[in-house]
């Protein structure tokens, strides 16, 4: 096996573990908050999502794309920030990581298997929440997340340089420092987006988070609404950053 293929395999495995850790954090915080009757449940979940996201990106960004979100990966593929077939494999490993995370979460917490997965499964929070509201919530939340991910990580602005490698505008050197804080920006975005969907879709904005409990329970209510909103929202967010809001020198 060549060095190139070893690096690719390491990247796929890294994305699997990044997705597993994120999924485990999300599912256990959701289930645990519900089981213990925490009135601050949404805050607990949002903080868990934000802090785990920051830790995962810092830990895995040297060996993999550290998306742990198929909507980000799909948008990166569509806008040629990621090879198509490589992106497909990354998404497969992401979903696998979330499925194992779902199983691990129900294994470590008390209660019946399916009851715990039903708690973790994204769903409308009230009967009067329509498909359109679920779609709209997931669409806009995913668009926001993917825009930020593109701006600071997937497709960040790169200051132009002359033939000697010097930046044409010395002040642009400050831009390079944003790469260090990119995980913080993405983590904060994960956190506040998690709070914005609590009255409608529950705020998933991640196809992997949606698919795992649905696959494990066999309950597919509104699955296409969630996925359509997330993938289309991701395309909007990525497209805006790539073609409209990318800095012009």
Swiss-Prot record:
It is a multi-pass membrane protein. The keyword Repeat applies. Residues 1-11, 61-83, 155-179, 247-249 are cytoplasmic. Keywords: Cell membrane, Membrane, Repeat, Transmembrane, Transmembrane helix, Transport. InterPro entries: Aquaporin-like, Aquaporin_transptr, MIP, MIP_CS. It is found in: Cell membrane. A motif (NPG) lies at residues 206-208. It comes from the Eukaryota. Residues 33-39, 105-133, 201-223 are extracellular. The chain crosses the membrane at residues 12-32, 40-60, 84-104, 134-154, 180-200, 224-246. A motif (NPA) lies at residues 69-71. One of its GO terms (molecular function) is water channel activity. Coiled coil: none annotated. Belongs to the MIP/aquaporin (TC 1.A.8) family. Aquaporins contain two tandem repeats each containing three membrane-spanning domains and a pore-forming loop with the signature motif Asn-Pro-Ala (NPA). In microsporidia, the second signature motif differs slightly and is Asn-Pro-Gly (NPG). Water channel required to facilitate the transport of water across membranes. Involved in osmotolerance. This is Aquaporin. It comes from Vairimorpha ceranae (strain BRL01) (Microsporidian parasite). The lineage of its organism: Eukaryota, Fungi, Fungi incertae sedis, Microsporidia, Nosematidae.
């Amino acid at each position: 096996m060549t060095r190139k293929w070893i690096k690719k395999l390491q990247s796929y495995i890294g994305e699997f573990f990044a997705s597993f850790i994120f999924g485990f954090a999300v599912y256990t915080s959701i289930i645990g908050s519900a089981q213990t009757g925490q009135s601050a449940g949404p805050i607990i979940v949002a903080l868990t999502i934000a802090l785990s996201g920051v830790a995962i990106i810092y830990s895995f960004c040297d060996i993999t794309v550290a998306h742990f979100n198929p909507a980000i990966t799909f948008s990166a593929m569509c806008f040629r920030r990621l090879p198509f077939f490589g992106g497909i494999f990354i998404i497969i490993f992401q979903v696998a990581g979330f499925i194992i995370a779902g199983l691990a979460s129900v294994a470590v917490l008390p209660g019946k298997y399916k009851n715990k997965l039903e708690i973790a499964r994204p769903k409308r929070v009230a009967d009067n929440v329509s498909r359109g509201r679920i779609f709209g919530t997931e669409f806009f939340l995913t668009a926001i997340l993917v825009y930020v991910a593109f701006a600071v990580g997937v497709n960040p602005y790169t200051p132009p340089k002359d033939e000697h490698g010097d930046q044409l505008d010395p002040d642009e050197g400050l831009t390079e420092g944003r790469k260090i804080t990119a995980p913080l920006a993405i983590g904060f975005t994960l956190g506040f987006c998690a709070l914005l969907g609590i009255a409608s879709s529950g705020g998933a904005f991640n196809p992997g988070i949606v698919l795992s409990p649905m696959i494990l329970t066999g309950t597919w209510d509104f699955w296409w609404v969630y996925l359509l909103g997330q993938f289309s929202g991701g395309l909007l967010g990525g497209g805006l950053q790539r073609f409209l809001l990318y800095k012009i020198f």
